[in-house]
């Protein structure tokens, strides 16, 4: 038999990795929070921090997405990542961290107690109230235009959420002018939603003239918007958003948790509360003081059901680099990112834009009916897609701007108490 001679070829692992993507992954380096072991590097340690990754040029934005079915370690990862980041980045040679957590289910209280975070519970008739129209650090006259735009975008999103439709051109324009009028009034440097409803009910001549309508005619045209905003001031949300903020945010503390669990089982109310609370936090975090801030938005999928709310969230994401804020969104299923809309709709396209502004994706196991969405939305190859459906508890597929890791997340003994979300299921 004639022997076949094949020319010898020598190549690097970088070339081989293009043939089989999981071969000899180099890892992301050691800078950041230690999270566990990277199974693609032979079990070496895995560390990550979105701000460090941004500074190294690994990503162009510090935002993160965490997705996974319940009970597979998603919540434990978020909590341990937060606790370790606050512990590590607290020395003289590091940039200090500050965290804000939107907690729809009330499950972050043990973590808050462990870290010394302030817990603020919002509930009807309670003593804590936030004003979504707060100026915060944007109260500087030089930033008035940005503040007015933010307020107008927020209120349009809130009204659209209640009305289940986008505002018509007249409503949109009149709303913006009403906010502009309030924002320019010295006695109302911090206008409230109640103030805005009052202007919509009795439009000043300056607003009515701009739309070429008599004030009483304009008031009737804005009735639906006024009723929509009043939903935030009455009934199940009474006392939560109907006046000036009663909460003092201490920038020298470690952070805060907004407990929204009282409205968790009311989907419509929770969407409004999440949106209003997110707006208040975004304004509160808009400080150029050199501190890196992490905003955690649990159950973020609830804000992706309408174009206005999705656009507002995307605008917040885009501002992250300006103020040193990393947004961490938590969802269950990757299909949530389609904004509960058919492919091709404007809302779905905006949600895809939001995903593009989130370059760090931490993916715990997804059910088989979610794998096609994962492949399509995240650009996973066949090997990664198959792996995503077979990950065990505590193990996640990481995608960092095209880089891949499979990480076994580790929980230290001292962290188990604030990671346990199954206490109500045990006798």
Predicted features, each with a name:
Residues 52, 59-72, 77-82, 96, ...:
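Conserved P-loop NTPase motor cores
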Residues 29-30, 41-43, 60-61, 81, ...:
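Short, well-ordered loop/turn elements at secondary-structure boundaries
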Residues 143-191, 342-427:
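P-loop NTPase motor core of the ASCE superfamily
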Residues 46, 56-58, 75, 110, ...:
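Short helix/loop capping segments that flank catalytic or ligand/cofactor-binding pockets
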Residues 17-40, 109-117, 132-325, 387, ...:
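P-loop NTPase motor domains
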Residues 72-137, 175:
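Walker A/P-loop NTP-binding active-site region of P-loop NTPases
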Residues 1-67, 414, 426:
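Basic- and hydrophobic-enriched, low-structure N-terminal and domain-boundary segments
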């Amino acid at each position: 038999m004639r022997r076949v001679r094949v020319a010898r070829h020598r190549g690097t692992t970088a070339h081989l990795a293009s043939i089989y993507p999981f071969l000899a992954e180099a890892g992301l380096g050691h800078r950041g929070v230690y999270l566990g072991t990277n199974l693609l590097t032979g079990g070496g340690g895995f560390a990550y921090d979105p701000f460090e990754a941004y500074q190294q040029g690994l990503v162009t934005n510090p935002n993160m997405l965490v997705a996974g079915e319940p009970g597979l370690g998603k919540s434990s990862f978020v909590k341990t990542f937060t606790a370790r980041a606050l512990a590590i980045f607290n020395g003289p040679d590091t940039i200090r961290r500050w965290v804000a957590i939107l907690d729809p289910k009330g499950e972050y209280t043990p973590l808050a107690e462990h870290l010394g975070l302030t817990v603020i519970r919002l509930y009807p008739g309670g003593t804590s109230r936030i004003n979504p129209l707060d100026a915060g650090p944007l109260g500087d006259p030089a930033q008035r235009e940005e503040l007015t735009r933010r307020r107008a975008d927020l209120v349009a999103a809130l009204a659209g959420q209640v009305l289940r439709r986008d505002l018509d051109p007249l409503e949109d324009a009149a709303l913006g002018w009403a906010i502009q009028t309030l924002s320019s009034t010295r006695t109302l440097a911090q206008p409230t939603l109640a103030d805005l409803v009052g202007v919509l009910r009795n439009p000043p001549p300056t607003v009515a003239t701009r739309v070429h309508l008599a004030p009483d005619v304009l008031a009737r045209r804005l009735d639906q918007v006024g009723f929509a905003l009043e939903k935030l001031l009455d009934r199940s949300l009474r006392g939560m958003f109907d006046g000036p903020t009663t909460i003092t945010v201490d920038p020298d503390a470690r952070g805060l948790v907004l407990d929204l669990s009282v409205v968790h089982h009311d989907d419509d109310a929770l969407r409004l509360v999440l949106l209003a609370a997110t707006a208040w936090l975004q304004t509160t975090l808009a400080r150029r003081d050199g501190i890196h801030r992490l905003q955690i938005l649990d159950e973020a999928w609830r804000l992706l059901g309408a174009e206005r709310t999705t656009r507002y969230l995307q605008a917040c994401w885009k501002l992250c680099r300006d103020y040193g804020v990393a947004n961490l969104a938590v969802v269950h299923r990757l299909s949530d990112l389609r904004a509960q809309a058919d492919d091709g709709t404007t809302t779905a396209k905006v949600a895809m834009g939001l995903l593009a502004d989130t370059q760090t994706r931490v993916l715990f196991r997804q059910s088989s009916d979610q794998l096609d969405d994962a492949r399509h939305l995240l650009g996973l190859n066949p090997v990664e897609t198959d792996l995503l459906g077979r990950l065990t508890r505590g193990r996640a597929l990481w995608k960092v701007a095209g880089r891949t890791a499979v990480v076994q997340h580790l929980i230290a003994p001292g962290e188990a108490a604030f990671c346990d979300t199954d206490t109500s299921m045990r006798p």
